[in-house]
């Protein structure tokens, strides 16, 4: 369970933003979407490799 303590005098929107950020980092929504339909291991591996290549290209272009 995610706990976000609200500091004294802190805006509720700021606390909500911190909660959303923590929730996003847990990856719960991403995992739920991935589990909606079965993905073959070969397809998952291919996607992972394509993402790695893409990220590498971005990194090289940045330099």
From Swiss-Prot:
Keywords: Ribonucleoprotein, Ribosomal protein
Single GO term (MF): structural constituent of ribosome
Domain of life: Bacteria
Keyword Ribosomal protein: yes
Transmembrane segments: none
One Pfam family matching this protein: Ribosomal_S21
InterPro entries: Ribosomal_bS21, Ribosomal_bS21_CS, Ribosomal_bS21_sf
GO biological process, one term: translation
Coiled coil: none
GO (cellular component) term, any one: ribonucleoprotein complex
Family: Belongs to the bacterial ribosomal protein bS21 family.
Name the record gives this protein: Small ribosomal subunit protein bS21
Lineage: Bacteria, Pseudomonadati, Bacteroidota, Bacteroidia, Bacteroidales
Name of encoding gene: rpsU
């Amino acid at each position: 369970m995610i706990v976000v303590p609200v500091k004294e005098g802190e805006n509720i929107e700021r606390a909500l933003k911190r909660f959303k950020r923590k929730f996003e980092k847990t990856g719960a929504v991403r995992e739920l979407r991935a589990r909606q339909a079965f993905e073959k291991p070969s397809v998952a591996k291919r996607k992972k490799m394509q993402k790695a290549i893409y990220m590498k290209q971005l990194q090289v272009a940045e330099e």
